[in-house]
Structures are given as C-alpha cells and as structure tokens.
Regions:
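Contiguous, non-catalytic segments that form substrate-binding/exosite surfaces or channel walls
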Residues: 1-71
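Short pre-active-site segment immediately N-terminal to the catalytic Zn-binding motif
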Residues: 63-79, 102-107
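Active-site recognition of the HExxH zinc-binding catalytic motif
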Residues: 78-91, 112
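Extended, non-globular alpha-helical segments
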Residues: 35-60, 77, 143-169
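Short helix-capping and hinge/turn segments at secondary-structure transitions, especially at repeat
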Residues: 38, 42, 72, 85-94, ...
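C-terminal catalytic core of tyrosine-transesterase DNA break-rejoin enzymes
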Residues: 108-111, 115
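Substrate-binding clefts and substrate-entry loops adjacent to catalytic sites
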Residues: 93-101
C-alpha cells in the first residue's frame, strides 16, 4: 500500500487519530476539562481498554467517565469533551424527563459528538472529518434523528455551558 500514516484513520477506523490543534496550549485545554469535571463531581478514570477500540465512555449509573490510556493526546481531549457532553445531557436526572425519541443511542451520540465538535473547534481542535463520519455512522446520515431542532437546541446549551466553564477554569489557573 502507498497509504500515509495520516490516512490510516480513514482506512482503518479503529486506528489512532492525531487531530490538528491550532490552539495555543493543549495541556491547558485538557487541564480545564479535568477541572470542570472535578467541579461538577464527574470522576475521570483512566485505564487501558484491552479488548475494545473505544476511546472512552460515560457511565450514568456512577456519573463517571472512563478514558482509554491508549488515546493520543488530542483524542483524549476530544473524547473527554464528548463524554462530558454525555454527562451533561444524558445523566439519569435529565434522561427521565426526555421524550422517548430523544432518549435513544443515535440521538445521544449525535448530540455528544456535535457538542465535542463545537467545543473542540472553538478551542482550535479540528475533528471535522472524524465527527462527520461518527455522526453519519450513528445516525445513518441523520435519518435516525427525529427531532433535529430539539437535539440541536440541547447541543447549543451544552456547548455554551462547557465552553464558558472552561474559560472560567482557564482564567482561574
């Protein structure tokens, strides 16, 4: 094959991504996310995922996030934003009040990834190709998202809350 390493994620979806970062300080961005999770009582657990290509997951029953220690630095930041979005929009308290059409995996993954894209992009993390592919796969090109307006309204609120909280965390460091 004549494929270059940067093409691997397109060819092999489970290969590691090294997203472009045009911001000033990826460590500071990561630290602001960790501070946000701490201030909102969302424990972050880091462990190697031996039999899974997953980058991380949010567990509503424990209101915690687990990240794969095999992630690249930029994957870790992106995944943490994605999982924090789940924690914000899909925790047990919020899920019980949602319409059934909003409480299904395709919608929840769409919302979390859209939030991760919006927040990451705001801070200079370019996940566009990955995010489009991820959303397309989960939603069958949005066919599985019935209420697009309500879904995006929640994404907007979660993106604003997370972005503004991160700014506050950065300013307080």
């Amino acid at each position: 094959t004549h494929a270059k390493p940067e093409d691997y994620p397109d060819i092999f979806p489970n290969k590691k991504n090294q997203f472009d970062f045009g911001g000033k300080d990826l460590d500071l961005l990561n630290q602001s996310l960790l501070e946000y999770s701490n201030s909102t009582n969302i424990p972050i657990i880091k462990e190697p995922f031996r039999d899974s290509a997953a980058k991380g997951y949010y567990m509503p029953s424990t209101h915690s996030i687990t990240l794969n220690t095999k992630n690249t630095e930029t994957e870790n930041v992106h995944t943490l934003i994605h999982e924090l979005a789940h924690a914000e929009m899909h925790n047990n308290n919020k899920l019980k009040d949602k319409e059934l059409s909003m409480n299904v995996p395709p919608v929840m993954e769409y919302q979390a990834e859209m939030t991760a894209y919006v927040v990451g992009n705001y801070y200079g993390l370019d996940t566009e190709k990955h995010s489009l592919r991820y959303i397309s796969n989960w939603t069958n090109n949005l066919e599985k998202v019935e209420d697009k307006i309500s879904s995006l309204s929640e994404v907007k609120k979660a993106s604003e809350k997370l972005s503004l909280s991160m700014v506050d965390e950065i300013l307080n460091m």
